[in-house]
Amino acid sequence: MHIRLRAILICALVTLPLAAQAQTFPGADWQRKTPAEAGINPQLLKDAIDFAIASEIKNPRDLKLNHYRTFGREPFGDAIGPIKDRGDLTGVIIHKGVLVAEWGEPQRVDMTHSVTKSLLSSVVGLAYDGGMIRSVDDIARDYMAPIQLYNPLPMSNRADRLGAPDLIDLFGTPHNRTITWNHLLRQTSDWEGALWGKPDWADRPTNKPDEWLTRPRDKAGTVYKYNDTRVNVLALAALNVWRRPLPQVLKEKIMEPIGASNTWRWFGYDNAWVVIDGQPVQSVTGGGHWGGGMFISAYDMARFGYLTLRRGKWGDRQVLSEKWVNMALTPTGLQSPYGFINYFLNTDRKQWPSAPSTAFMHNGNGLNMVYVDPENDLVAVVRWIDNNAVDGFLKRLIAAVAEKS
């Protein structure tokens, strides 16, 4: 009996360091190892990095110019938030919680575009974890207080505005009253209207202009459509629930606990100001479609990716509930490679055939990618890579990890 108990204790002591090693977390800086020290084939990893560098996007680094060549050509496409020129193609590779490779300008703060959406959904997740949102299947309208647009000039009662609403009603139409938090999080709401001067139909409009204003609405939850106006609706709805600026919530409850730097900023639009409890507050955006969104370094992006790799846990603290992260990773029935914004899934290995089906990615225009691979214990941040080269890069990266040095 004593021998058996002793054997059990010895096994426990042996496995404890292994468990701790499997759950390594960075302090103020990432622990660093060479690829060889981390058990990664150095030459194959170099091949992957060289492939990424050779696959830099051809778009101009002047992102304001790039905007007016792309999204800026849409109806009402003017940029109304800040835009910043981008840097070099940059990457950071984290394996088993240790930084094994970096290149480019990983400290540089750049626009991360729609990776912002993953941070936005996380702030909604914090509201869910805290009981402020009881269920994602609840009707969003039931959580809304009146929203006053901030205007420093007293114009709301002028005669030329007689009959115009003084308040923003996000969910006032019969269709919008049926929208749940889940619909907004999965981009299946078909929300109708305009917010911050951007009509829902003006984002990636169809080639049928006659239908832009007249098409019948799809029942909420029945059609998936990627749409930044509707994501910005979610951001304003979340602000209305939190009653405080979302960047403050993110900083206090996620970025500080995971040790992010103080260099990131989350911007909204010039006109996206409302009054919350007597104070003007900017409602942030879910991306850089019309400017704004999250401006952040690759190092800090890697920390967020690592948080989601560990299912919301950081050290001994559960920053985001595991339940929330698992919900975010649940495929949207209408769009199986998509979970909550902006979790792109590898369901049936359709998105990236070279990666495991359990891998997922936080994606943004550019391409900004935060690749998360639980099977290989990997996080890879790559910025400004051609989207068509992503699977080729992942194929080479995974080969480097799989084939020991």
Regions found by a protein language model. Name each.
Residues 19-106, 130-133, 244, 400-405:
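N-terminal leader/targeting segments and the immediately adjacent pre-domain N-terminus
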Residues 55-58, 139-263, 299-302, 307:
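Active-site-adjacent helix/loop patches that line small-molecule binding or acyl-intermediate pockets
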Residues 7-17:
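Bacterial N-terminal signal peptides
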Residues 81-94, 102-144, 218-223, 292, ...:
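Short active-site loop at a secondary-structure junction
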Residues 262, 272-288, 326-379:
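Active-site Gly/Thr loop motif
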Residues 361-405:
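Structured C-terminal helix/loop/strand segments within mature extracytoplasmic catalytic/sensor domains
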Residues 41, 97, 111-136, 184, ...:
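Active-site SXXK
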Residues 118, 122, 187, 230-237, ...:
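Active-site-proximal alpha-helical segments within enzyme catalytic domains
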